[in-house]
Amino acid sequence: MKLAVYGKGGIGKSTTSCNISVALAKRGKKVLQIGCDPKHDSTFTLTGFLIPTIIDTLQEKDYHYEDVWPEDVIYKGYGGVDCVEAGGPPAGAGCGGYVVGETVKLLKELNAFDEYDVILFDVLGDVVCGGFAAPLNYADYCLIVTDNGFDALFAANRIAASVREKARTHPLRLAGLIGNRTSKRDLIEKYIEAVPMPVLEVLPLIEDIRVSRVKGKTLFEMAEQDPSLDYVCDYYLNIADQILARPEGVVPNDTPDRELFSLLSDFYLNPGKPQVPNSEEELDLMIV
């Protein structure tokens, strides 16, 4: 099974991806997480350091694939999750999608691509150009990470459009949305009224999720020292269980940009009844 995780830049895709990977491993699956971001920090939470990228390794070997060994590019992370970072071209040059293609090509050359029960692609940002939509060509399911905010849902809508386009020629389905660090879900609910799709889980607004990223540890690893975090791990285990059940998923219908802008902004600015935010937790959406 191959998964592609997308979402607005900075929404918490890598943290979410790492915890889902560990949850899948705890369900007895052999998991490979592939970071598809030039920042090459997708797997930092699993390994605790920035691992060398495939592109760096290929450059060192003068692009002689036969000189690359699995241990040169595949690193063991927490929970037994194997980790790969695709890397990227020099800033302002080249195509990230090409890098993803080279990564898959090398892993196939190493006979590694088919050794895993689950391969998870963690893909950069919300700009789903043809290049960075490349992981969708390999994926069975797409997962979109969002929050209860306007911008994240706007990005989710564009990603949904990419899933629909790829599904024309590939057996790809959208598994659903994952709400990350949000105390409310009213805008999420409003969005899925317009664009029906499952919501796999909505993670609570707790600082430990953000802290885990800085520490370079998954929530599961942190919970070993602080059992009070076990309940957070259960959210990721629930997502893993839903994915392993091989859901039917959907081929989404995106809403035109202007229509979605109007829908969400009107809902936010004109709620059904007056609401006065009384804490930081309720300020999930900020329009600037």
Curated annotation (Swiss-Prot):
Catalytic reaction list: chlorophyllide a + oxidized 2[4Fe-4S]-[ferredoxin] + 2 ADP + 2 phosphate = protochlorophyllide a + reduced 2[4Fe-4S]-[ferredoxin] + 2 ATP + 2 H2O
Pathway: Porphyrin-containing compound metabolism; chlorophyll biosynthesis (light-independent)
GO molecular function, one term: 4 iron, 4 sulfur cluster binding
Binding site for Mg(2+): 14
Coiled coil residues, start to end: none
GO biological process, one term: photosynthesis, dark reaction
Record-listed E.C. numbers: 1.3.7.7
InterPro entries: NifH/chlL_CS, NifH/frxC, P-loop_NTPase, Protochlorophyllide_ATP-bd
Annotated positions binding [4Fe-4S] cluster: 95, 129
Family that this chain belongs to: Belongs to the NifH/BchL/ChlL family.
Assembly, per entry: Homodimer. Protochlorophyllide reductase is composed of three subunits; ChlL, ChlN and ChlB.
Protein name per UniProt: Light-independent protochlorophyllide reductase iron-sulfur ATP-binding protein
Lineage: Bacteria, Bacillati, Cyanobacteriota, Cyanophyceae, Nostocales
